[in-house]
Amino acid sequence: MHAYLHCLSHSPLVGYVDPAQEVLDEVNGVIASARERIAAFSPELVVLFAPDHYNGFFYDVMPPFCLGVGATAIGDFGSAAGELPVPVELAEACAHAVMKSGIDLAVSYCMQVDHGFAQPLEFLLGGLDKVPVLPVFINGVATPLPGFQRTRMLGEAIGRFTSTLNKRVLFLGSGGLSHQPPVPELAKADAHMRDRLLGSGKDLPASERELRQQRVISAAEKFVEDQRTLHPLNPIWDNQFMTLLEQGRIQELDAVSNEELSAIAGKSTHEIKTWVAAFAAISAFGNWRSEGRYYRPIPEWIAGFGSLSARTEN
């Protein structure tokens, strides 16, 4: 069967701190084109690789990877909220297959996800509940982090499993590219924030969540005025990364350490490993070709914003 892939940056700042209208129109046009290609492909199953931002995963237990056998989106920053339509038996079978391949994949029957999962489902499929989905969390902010090699191997294992299903499979990668928004770090946290990072942040009071979101919005507004206030975006790195993906050279990223990536492009750039997993997964279906490449640094969203598709040729 055929597979399709789309990788897309996300940002909680969409609708809160937007770029100029012509830039917004350009991005919306790119997303609309991707949505049309996906609709024409008519996926029967979605595999969504996405990170979390201390909304569902915390330091009480922080796996490098987790497959949601059941998952609910919390609706942060106005994103879609509700249950994801996870096919339970298929998710369980996927977990067993990945474990048998040598990848230690955690599972959750009550996974809580945020805008990192919700935005691609909203933007590209029209909602959370349009197509059965296997949601796969890849830790992109909480050290210690998985590396490129292990993430690639995860994607390959999931790709091999889904290639046996006789279904049209859509792989989505959500996140990146270069960026470093204000995300708390356990080593630097005060007592209150440490408690939140250790797990109490899963059920934040509405007032505290609003303050947290406002801090991110304020940081974006300052970044637009002075891009020295946060780690700068890195368009050169972002475009080199996208070229590696298009050329099927993702294995070369194995040599890039987590420390190097943080220094080059920002501490939240590790979200690009969702793209690596997606491209590794589609490779299990045979030959593919990329299409629809788009990139633009968007300070208002604190992101090097990228969009890239691929389709199998067999």
Curated annotation (Swiss-Prot):
Keywords: Aromatic hydrocarbons catabolism, Dioxygenase, Iron, Oxidoreductase. Changing residue 181 to A: More than 2-fold decrease in catalytic activity and 100-fold decrease in affinity. SUPFAM superfamilies: LigB-like. Its EC number is 1.13.11.16. The keyword Iron applies. The active site is at 115 (proton donor), 179 (proton acceptor). The keyword Iron applies. Disulfide bonds: none annotated. GO terms for molecular function: 3-carboxyethylcatechol 2,3-dioxygenase activity; ferrous iron binding. One of its GO terms (biological process) is 3-phenylpropionate catabolic process. Signal peptide: none annotated. It catalyses: 3-(2,3-dihydroxyphenyl)propanoate + O2 = (2Z,4E)-2-hydroxy-6-oxonona-2,4-dienedioate + H(+); (2E)-3-(2,3-dihydroxyphenyl)prop-2-enoate + O2 = (2Z,4E,7E)-2-hydroxy-6-oxonona-2,4,7-trienedioate + H(+). Changing residue 114 to N: Low level of catalytic activity, 600-fold lower than the wild-type enzyme. More than 8000-fold decrease in affinity. Changing residue 114 to A: Complete loss of extradiol cleavage activity. Homotetramer. Belongs to the LigB/MhpB extradiol dioxygenase family. HAMAP family: MhpB. Catalyzes the non-heme iron(II)-dependent oxidative cleavage of 2,3-dihydroxyphenylpropionic acid and 2,3-dihydroxicinnamic acid into 2-hydroxy-6-ketononadienedioate and 2-hydroxy-6-ketononatrienedioate, respectively. This is 2,3-dihydroxyphenylpropionate/2,3-dihydroxicinnamic acid 1,2-dioxygenase. It comes from Escherichia coli (strain K12).
